[in-house]
Swiss-Prot record:
This is General transcription factor IIE subunit 1. It comes from Homo sapiens (Human). Zn(2+) binds at C129, C132, C154, C157. InterPro entries: TFE, TFIIE/TFIIEa_HTH, TFIIE_asu, TFIIE_asu_C, TFIIEa/SarR/Rpc3_HTH_dom, Znf_RING/FYVE/PHD, Znf_TFIIB. The modification Phosphoserine is found at S268.
Length: 439
């Protein structure tokens, strides 16, 4: 059977006491937070955030301040959501028994502090010497008193001392204590009224409660969301397939059909026009190399050469080098013949040499298209012969006399003896040799 003296509801006096204290000694944020806890016995932190519209950091600072002063208590509970996730929530409530004790303690501490200040700042006489500025208390009055003159004199300079007005208290401590008692009287009255109140355990340690205002707003929001979902159901169905799908994330379907590749390639080639031959196949990109005119002068058929190039899309590298060397040799021989014709006739020995070179050049003329497929060994031998021929030192005419090019290069006085035509031929030959060297 329950004790008739135990109260199952919080008395109005305790609620007024909490409101008076929180509004008298704390800020407006603390008062708002405590008002919610007065109206609702145990409130979750998230619900307080929803009601007060505070920032979470600001609300926690306010609650931690009240909790540090023992006005409120905190209880942590672990809750399991519908999806199985566990979350921790803080619930705050007021323990009114602790609240009353804390208020009594703080008021008593304030009263003792005021009484201490009153006792320390009692109107005690203090003396100061106007000459040496020495100060004396009322306990030193027997040393300052001069019985001959009946005055208080300084013990150092024997000058009559004066009462120190700066040491007088600014306010009367007894007046301050009376004002404190007058202002705190309503709180004292509430404390006397709640002196013998005995609260039940479920009031001192309440269970979490649902706030009606928040419950109504949540129900209204749920109803609105349900109506919106019913109204836009077909829209969600249309977007149902737009969500992320991870079933076929690592599935790749590759189909390889080798039969149709040749037909597709042939059809693509038929649809495209024939590409124009690049300039590096039609003409030489090296300055001084053979061109169409040189090829005609050298007895090379341009059409036959192009047919051979088209017939062999990928000629051998050795064959290309050989043809280039043959044509360069042809040009060198023609230049040498021109220089000899411009100067005096050469000796019979030199003539025999030029004839042998001409015959060798004729023997080494570019092969006909029918002779392209000769044996690899024969091509290597011909290439070696060509390199040996190119390595021969050309002949330069100096005042009608033949000299080797290397000899003229080492003897500058021979260049001074040349005629203008011989000097021009000498310079042209040097340029061709330089171009042949870097090709």
């Amino acid at each position: 059977m329950a004790d008739p003296d135990v109260l199952t509801e919080v008395p109005a006096a305790l609620k007024r006491l909490a409101k008076y204290v929180i509004r008298g000694f704390y800020g407006i944020e603390h008062a708002l937070a405590l008002d919610i806890l007065i109206r609702n016995s145990c409130v979750k932190e998230e619900d307080m955030l929803e009601l007060l519209k505070f920032d979470r950091k600001q609300l926690r600072s306010v609650l931690n301040n009240l909790k540090g002063d023992k006005f409120i208590k905190c209880r942590m509970r672990v809750e399991t959501a519908a999806d199985g996730k566990t979350t921790r929530h803080n619930y705050y409530f007021i323990n009114y028994r602790t609240l009353v004790n804390v208020v009594k303690y703080k008021l008593d501490h304030m009263r003792r502090r005021i009484e201490t200040d009153e006792r320390d700042s009692t109107n005690r006489a203090s003396f100061k010497c106007p000459v040496c500025s020495s100060t004396f208390t009322d306990l030193e009055a027997n040393q300052l008193f001069d019985p001959m003159t009946g005055t208080f004199r300084c013990t150092f300079c024997h000058t009559e001392v004066e009462e120190d007005e700066s040491a007088m208290p600014k306010k009367d401590a007894r007046t301050l204590l009376a004002r404190f008692n007058e202002q705190i009287e309503p709180i004292y009255a509430l404390l006397r009224e709640t002196e013998d109140v005995n609260l039940a355990y479920e009031i001192l340690e309440p269970e979490p409660t649902e706030i009606p205002a928040l419950k109504q707003s949540k129900d209204h929001a749920a109803t609105t969301a349900g109506a919106a979902s019913l109204a836009g159901g077909h829209h969600r169905e249309a977007w149902a397939t737009k969500g992320p799908s991870y079933e076929d994330l690592y599935t790749q379907n590759v189909v390889i059909n080798m039969d149709d590749q040749e037909d597709l390639h042939r059809a693509s080639l038929e649809g495209k026009s024939a590409k124009e031959r690049p300039i590096w196949l039609r003409e030489s990109t090296v300055q001084g190399a053979y061109g169409s005119e040189d090829m005609k002068e050298g007895g090379i058929d341009m059409d036959a050469f192009q047919e051979r190039e088209e017939g062999h899309a990928g000629p051998d590298d050795n064959e290309e080098v050989m043809r280039a060397l043959l044509i360069h040799e042809k040009k060198t021989s023609s230049a040498m013949a021109g220089s000899v014709g411009a100067a005096a006739p050469v000796t019979a020995a030199n003539g025999s040499d030029s004839e042998s070179e001409t015959s060798e050049s004729d023997d080494d003329s570019p092969p006909r298209p029918a002779a392209v497929a000769v044996h690899k060994r024969e091509e290597d031998e011909e290439e070696d012969d060509e390199f040996e021929e190119v390595a021969d030192d050309p002949i330069v005419m100096v005042a009608g006399r033949p000299f080797s090019y290397s000899e003229v290069s080492q003897r500058p006085e021979l260049v001074a003896q040349m005629t203008p035509e011989e000097k021009e031929a000498y310079i042209a030959m040097g340029q061709r040799m330089f171009e042949d060297l870097f090709e």
